[in-house]
UniProtKB/Swiss-Prot annotation:
UniProt similarity note: Belongs to the universal ribosomal protein uL14 family.
Keyword check for tRNA processing: no
Record-level GO BP terms: translation
Species: Allorhizobium ampelinum (strain ATCC BAA-846 / DSM 112012 / S4) (Agrobacterium vitis (strain S4))
Descriptive protein name: Large ribosomal subunit protein uL14
Amino acid sequence: MIQMQTNLDVADNSGARRVMCIKVLGGSKRKYASVGDIIVVSIKEAIPRGRVKKGDVMKAVVVRTAKDIRRADGSVIRFDNNAAVLIDNKKEPIGSRIFGPVPRELRAKNHMKIISLAPEVL
């Protein structure tokens, strides 16, 4: 459950390290984002010579949440941290690598490029 003002780790090599959610996309009164949802983020911490810099406003896909994800078979999956992958306007990842595991739920939300770059799909 990601809402406005939530800080997230960045799970790609775009150059950003920490981002803050400033808007959850999808409806005027939408409060929370879960795995696979697109949010608008502000870059709070970035590495030198990265593709993005501190203060940039971008879109991102939530790939990990500390809140439980319930599956149709009754199982539950949760992660240690909240993480996102920065995307461009064509919904393609900005980075060329993804770090850490991502859940299968991204496939249902048509983020196939992120699934293919990820080292592990849970």
